[in-house]
Amino acid sequence: MALLHMAVTEPLDLGDGAGLSRIAKERLHVLHVNHLLRGEDADADQHFVQETCDSLGVPCTALRVDVAKFAQERDGNVEDVGRRVRYDAARELAQKLCIEQGVSRQKAKILTAHTADDRAETFMMNVMRGSGMSGLASIPRHRGLIYRPL
């Protein structure tokens, strides 16, 4: 939620080389994916996100996806499947919004709220897995449509 408040109220450095820039409020759209893993707590989170977006005047799309079921069907890890579901949904929504607004898809930016701690954790997980030199990297601040300004 911190990223949403920042995007609405102040300039952000997206790590794209453009420095600090404001995001036009009418271009913001929040995606919340409820993975259905935490019962009432997840439902409360979804409700909180939707209420916050309403109070800020930012449209919100909420999806409910049974990630545990997807993971079981695909013999996958729940975290990995959840991540793929979120990023796939974000890309699809970005494409849809670009088409609706008549904007080139290359203009789309998906902001995620990864923090420095998340990036450090990814680096340490790669070290513990025994990654070679190419694997000793953290989450990049920018990759494709994805930007991580925090």
PLM regions: where:
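Core alpha/beta nucleotide-donor-binding catalytic domains of modification enzymes
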Residues: 1-150
